[in-house]
Design a protein with these regions (language model features):
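A short beta-strand-loop structural module common to alpha/beta enzyme folds
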Residues: 12-24
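Helix-loop-strand module that forms the ligand-binding subsite of alpha/beta enzymes
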Residues: 23-107
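Glycine-rich phosphate/pyrophosphate-binding loop and the adjoining helix
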Residues: 100-146
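Charged catalytic carboxylate motif
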Residues: 1, 29, 87, 129, ...
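Generic secondary-structure signature for well-ordered alpha-helical cores
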Residues: 10-14, 60, 93, 97, ...
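N-terminal beta1-alpha1 ligand-phosphate binding loop
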Residues: 1-12
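Generic non-transmembrane alpha-helix signal with a bias for helix starts/N-cap capping motifs
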Residues: 2-3, 23, 85, 123
Length: 146
């Protein structure tokens, strides 16, 4: 999903797109970016532990320094995803970020332990939605809309 969104954003050649895994991202990356697309699996009705760690490490160093920047959210969920989206929205509200779209929730319908642990295959329509969200964020930044 994140790779598809990055590919969509990269179509906007006026911008530099940087795709980072949560453990590799730091406050400096947030401060250097003009906008954000946060992507995470939902685990036990919450954002992943690695994404939570990212927000824990970067929240205060970025506070009052990223106000007004645009953001979007993508969640890969087994059945719901809304609680994870709300968690990120609350963090983004604290940072005073501006949402550009409702959270994109891709539901895998994984309900059994085997399905939950299995590597997920995201379908073409969902990947296109991810690409489109990345492209929308990038185009809005390039045009000065966001």
């Amino acid at each position: 999903m994140a790779q598809a969104a990055a590919a969509g954003a990269a179509a906007e050649t006026a911008l530099a797109v940087k795709l980072l895994a949560a453990p590799d991202a730091a406050a400096g990356d947030l401060l250097a970016a003009d906008g954000y697309l946060f992507a995470t699996p939902e685990n036990l009705a919450a954002i992943s532990g690695l994404m939570k760690d990212f927000f824990d490490r970067t929240y205060y160093p970025a506070l009052e320094r990223v106000n007004g920047r645009p953001y979007a959210v993508m969640i890969c969920a087994g059945s719901d995803g809304h609680n994870a989206a709300r968690q990120i929205e609350r963090i983004a509200t604290g940072w005073r970020l501006t949402p550009i779209a409702p959270a994109l929730i891709v539901c895998t319908h994984a309900q059994t332990p085997e399905e939950i642990l299995r590597t997920k295959q995201i379908g073409p329509a969902d990947l296109e939605s991810c690409r489109s969200l990345g492209a929308t964020l990038a185009a809005g930044l390039a045009l000065g809309i966001f």
